[in-house]
Regions:
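Short, charged, low-complexity patches
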Residues: 160, 290-299
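Short amphipathic alpha-helical signal-transduction/dimerization elements
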Residues: 168, 299-310
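Ligand-site clamp/hinge motif
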Residues: 285-288
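Intrinsically disordered, low-complexity acidic/polar segments
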Residues: 278, 290-292, 308
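Gram-negative outer-membrane assembly/targeting C-terminal domains
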Residues: 306-327
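Beta-lactam-recognizing serine transpeptidase/beta-lactamase-like catalytic domain environment
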Residues: 1-23, 29-283, 323-327
Length: 327
């Protein structure tokens, strides 16, 4: 939260330093784990009957809102509708160790190595982390919470961008960089290895994700089709924002509870175009209340990127006096 009296907080680069629970945007991690380990297949159906029978009385958001569950859903549908019950069940079946392992496979909880000072690690919910802070008993309810992106899970927006890029590109590790190239005065290009060494020595960070995620295209396709349903099919949690969009988008909304009623952090993650991705977008709005607001921001970003924004920004001289008064 911005505070004009905080002389340090205003300079925080939130993209690389702010760690927030990802909420339902974490569900593609759990989906990847369940499919890749054979716990389910893309056609497996789970019956969301409302309140999950194990854990601590957790229920799907749909049940909380309408008094009934989603009914039988497969994975693609569960992502589209953001069905918590479905992912509670996957979490209960697999356990926290498998979930945390696949989160790490996607680079969550690991620095990207971007050439900026201040990047933080993030936190993957795990027994190891819990033990490190004196939380020595891991309960089933903790796993259910972690499976929908809560519990101890906290990641930076830049980590989330790498994660979504890997979902889009088939699981390939992504070099996160603000440098396209560096050219010496003699016209020769500085090698990637030299740049990485310099960044490590001066900024003190490096890409901590060293391997690709080996997951089948069939399994990733089931996940990505669910993300497409989020934006392009009635009932999708971002359908109202993208229903008339001219380009097919894959997306996922998320609302991460903060402990204060009505002040959930809102997320949107996505990529476009769906068939041949060019851009991954991550939007975080603190205390937004839900992930719906973030989809509007993501749409504006994509409109600008794809040249769909016909409005030109012009200088407004009339605004200068009012701006000066609040500096």
């Amino acid at each position: 939260e911005y505070d004009a009296n905080d002389e340090t907080g205003k300079y925080v680069n939130r993209a690389i330093s702010t760690e927030k629970a990802p909420g339902s945007t974490f569900k593609m991690v759990v989906a990847s784990a369940a499919l890749d380990t054979g716990e389910i297949t893309p056609s497996t159906r789970i019956n969301d009957s409302g309140i999950y029978p194990y854990g601590d009385g957790q229920a799907c958001w749909y049940y909380r809102s309408y008094g009934v569950g989603h009914g039988y859903l497969n994975l693609t549908q569960a992502i589209k509708y953001s069905c918590n019950y479905f992912f509670y069940d996957l979490g209960y079946r697999m356990g926290i160790d498998t979930i945390s392992k696949y989160a790490s496979y996607y680079g969550l909880g690991k620095r990207t190595g971007i050439e900026l000072i201040g990047e933080t690690d993030g936190i993957v919910a795990s027994r190891e982390y819990a033990n490190s802070i004196g939380y020595n008993t891991w309960y089933p309810a903790d796993t259910l919470s972690a499976a929908i992106g809560q519990s101890f899970n906290q990641f930076t927006p830049i980590q989330m961008a790498r994660y979504i890029s890997m979902v889009a590109n088939g699981g390939k590790n992504v070099d996160v960089s603000i440098i396209k190239s560096i050219v010496n005065p003699d016209g020769t290009e500085v090698s990637k290895e030299e740049i990485e060494s310099f960044v490590k020595d001066t900024v003190g960070t490096e890409n901590e994700l060293t391997e690709d995620l080996d997951i089948s295209e069939e399994n990733l396709d089931a996940i990505r089709r669910g993300m497409k349903g989020v934006t392009s099919e009635p009932g999708g949690t971002a359908y109202s924002t993208f229903a008339d969009f001219d380009i097919d988008i894959a997306g996922k909304t998320g609302s991460a509870q903060t402990g204060v009623e009505g002040e959930a952090d809102g997320w949107f993650v996505g990529f476009a175009p769906f068939d041949e991705p060019e851009i991954a977008v991550v939007v975080l709005v603190e205390k937004a209340g839900s992930g719906g607001y973030t989809a509007d921001v993501a749409r504006a970003i994509m409109e600008e990127y794809f040249g769909m924004n016909s409005e030109e920004i012009t200088e407004d001289k009339s605004a200068e006096s009012s701006i000066e008064s609040v500096r």
